[in-house]
Amino acid sequence: MTIQNVIDRVRMIKTGCVIDDLRVIEDINRVENYIIKDIVSKRTGDEAAQDYGNYDEETPRDRELLAPAPYDTVYVDFCCAQIDREYEDSERYVNSMASYNNGMTQLKKWWWQNHRQKKLNRFYERGF
């Protein structure tokens, strides 16, 4: 999924809301940084994440994001949850965050099944 795909999907889902591209990009950065810090950095393959999570309005909108399909829905879920929070729609916020948390759990399981644990000196780094 690309940055523009996330922006378009959020706009499609939240049709009655005022949505700023920069705000969506900031939320994408938050999700990417969480993925890097809590999922990717504890396993091999973390060198792939070096160029992610630092997007701004100058970043090309066709930039691919870190989470692969089918786990890439976490970006849309998180952005929608933040909009729901701003509009004080607690029921939708809870639903969006539940979907986001489920997606993150699935992404973490997939990443950790497909990437070996990092070895620091002679010991493995503790994780999940």
Question: What are the residue ranges of the model-derived segments?
Answer:
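Charged interaction segments
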Residues: E88, S99-N101
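Short, compact, well-ordered microdomains
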Residues: V94-A98, T105
